[in-house]
C-alpha cells in the first residue's frame, strides 16, 4: 500500500493514543480487587463394577453429575460422610484409583422436544440410530416432582388400545397407570406394542423405554412400530443389557421426562416401560455394590419408593394447566405365575389396575392370554365410551360363568339345554376376544360386535368363522355407513346414535351368512381344509381346519387298515382302535372287513358290544370292550359254515378270538 503524504503525522497520533490506552488499562487493574477462586477436586479411592468411590467432594448434591479425568461421567448415587458412591454412565476404562474428579453443579438432564420424535436414543439423549446429534436447546431433569393433587383432574377419557378384551373389560384411561404382568413369553410386550400401534390414528405421543432387553428384541419392537404404527410420533429410549447399569437405572426416569414435555403443553402421551422387574434388579445390584443394607429378597428398603415416585408422575392435568395427560403401561415379569412376590405386589399396589397374562392360556393359543379373573382396571367404566360400556355390560359375567361351566363339564356331560346354550355362547365369546397381533379394532367395530353378540347373531355361527368375521367387519361397516349416509350430509357420530348402532348390528347377520356360504362353497369345491381356512379365517381358523383334516385322515387310515389286513388281524386292529373312533366308524370297519372276505356287508352281525360314548365324554374303556367280546358272536370271514357255527364259545371262531385277545393283552 502506498503511504499517504500525511503518514508521519498519523503515526505520531497512533503512538500517543496507544500510550494513553495502556495507561488507562494499568489504572483499571490497580483498582480491581482480586479474590481467590477455588474449585474442589476429588480423588477416586477405588472403582469396581461400574461404581467409583470418591473422596474430597463434601458439597456434592444427590444425582449431581461428576466428570472424571478423561471425560467419563457419572452421577452421585449415595452420599456418605467420607465417600461418595458415583454410578458411572460410561465404560469405566481409564477410571482408576487417584483419578481426579470434578463437580459440574448440574443434575442429570435429558433433551426433550419434538426433535426426539422418530428417534432412537439412550437415556442421556445420545442418538443410537446413526442420525444427527440432538439439539439440546431444551432439557429436563430426569428426576421431577409428580403433579400435586390440586393440579390433577379425573381420568375420564379412554385410551383406545384396539384390543377388544382390554377395551371392553379393562378399559385404560388417559392418565391411568395400568400394569401388564405375567410370566416370561406370555405376550406382555406384544400387548403393549399393540397399544402403541393403535395410536397411529390418535393424538397420543408414545415413548417406549427398553430396560435390560436384548438388542435383537428391541430391534424387533422398533421394526414392528415402523411397519404397522406411526414411528414419527414415537420416541424409543433404549438401555440394552450390554450397557452400564447406571444407564439402565435412569432409563425410565428419562422416558417419563421426555413424555412430560408433551403433557405439560396440553398434549397426551403414553409411556411403556419394558420392564420394571429388570429395573428393580438393577436397583438391587447398585444398592449391594454401594453397601446399602439389603431387605426382603435382597432388595433395598427404598425400592417401593423408587417405583412409586416414578409412576406417580403419570397423571391427567387439570384444565387450568392445559388438560394434558401422561398414561403409563409398566410391564413386570412373574416367576411361575407368583403374583405374591415382592416386586409384583409393590407394583400392583402402586398402579391403577393390572392385566394378568396366563401362560396356560397362551399355550392354548388364546392371544392375548388375559386372565379375566385376576385382571382389573380401577378406573374402568369411568373412562369407557358410553356405547361400549352399554354393549359390554354382561360380557365379563357371561365369560366367567362359561369358564366355570367348562371346567365342571370336563368330568361329565351336559343334559340341560340352557347350560348347553351357555357353553355355546361362551365359546363364541372366547373366539371373539382371541385377536391376532396388529389387527386393531376401532371403537365402532367393538361396539357393533358386542351388540351382535348380545342379540344372538353369533349363536348359530361356528367358532371357526369368528376370525374371518372380525377381519371383514371394518370394511363391511364402512360400506354400510356409506350407504346409510345421505349425500352432502354433515359428519355424524355413529357411536352416539343408538338406533344407527342397532341397525349396524343387525346387518352383521347378513355378513355372517355370506361368510358361512363362502365356507360351504369352498368345502363343496373340494378345497383343502388348510386353504379354505387360510382364505376365510386366517391363522386361527387354519389351525382348527388342520385339526379337522387330521381327524378325518385318522378315520380314513383306520378303514384302509381294515381292508388290507387278514380277517384275524382285522378283528384285532378293530378292537385296538375302538377306544378312539366312534361307533359308526367301527361298523364301517367291520363292513369293510366283511367285503374283503367276500361276504355281503348286509349279512354282517351287528357289533352289540361296541363301546358306548358317554354324553359329551370319551368312549368306554378298552377293558370293557374286551370283556364284552367274550360273550358275543363275532363276524367271521371264512364263509357261511363259520357264520352258522352253533356256539360262539367253541369251534374255530372261539379259538381265533381267544388267540387274538391273548396277543392283545400281551
UniProtKB/Swiss-Prot annotation:
Pfam family, one: ATP-synt_ab
Substrates-to-products reaction catalysed: ATP + H2O + 4 H(+)(in) = ADP + phosphate + 5 H(+)(out)
Any GO CC annotation of this UniProt entry: proton-transporting ATP synthase complex
Residue segments, region Disordered: 527-666
Keywords: ATP synthesis, ATP-binding, Cell inner membrane, Cell membrane, CF(1), Hydrogen ion transport, Ion transport, Membrane, Nucleotide-binding, Translocase, Transport
Compositional bias (Low complexity): 591-601
InterPro entries: ATP_synth_asu-like_sf, ATP_synth_asu_C, ATP_synth_asu_C_sf, ATP_synth_F1_a_nt-bd_dom, ATP_synth_F1_asu, ATPase_a/bsu_AS, ATPase_F1/V1/A1_a/bsu_N, ATPase_F1/V1/A1_a/bsu_N_sf
SUPFAM superfamilies: C-terminal domain of alpha and beta subunits of F1 ATP synthase, N-terminal domain of alpha and beta subunits of F1 ATP synthase, P-loop containing nucleoside triphosphate hydrolases
Lineage: superkingdom: Bacteria
Residues noted as binding ATP in the record, renumbered to the chain: 182-189
PROSITE patterns: ATPASE_ALPHA_BETA
Keyword Nuclease: no
Residue ranges, compositional bias (Basic and acidic residues): 545-590, 623-641
Residue ranges that the Swiss-Prot or TrEMBL entry lists as coiled coil: none
Main location: membrane
Site positions per UniProt: Required for activity: 375
Protein's job: Produces ATP from ADP in the presence of a proton gradient across the membrane. The alpha chain is a regulatory subunit.
Subunit structure, interactors included: F-type ATPases have 2 components, CF(1) - the catalytic core - and CF(0) - the membrane proton channel. CF(1) has five subunits: alpha(3), beta(3), gamma(1), delta(1), epsilon(1). CF(0) has three main subunits: a(1), b(2) and c(9-12). The alpha and beta chains form an alternating ring which encloses part of the gamma chain. CF(1) is attached to CF(0) by a central stalk formed by the gamma and epsilon chains, while a peripheral stalk is formed by the delta and b chains.
Similarity comment text for this entry: Belongs to the ATPase alpha/beta chains family.
Name this polypeptide is given: ATP synthase subunit alpha 2
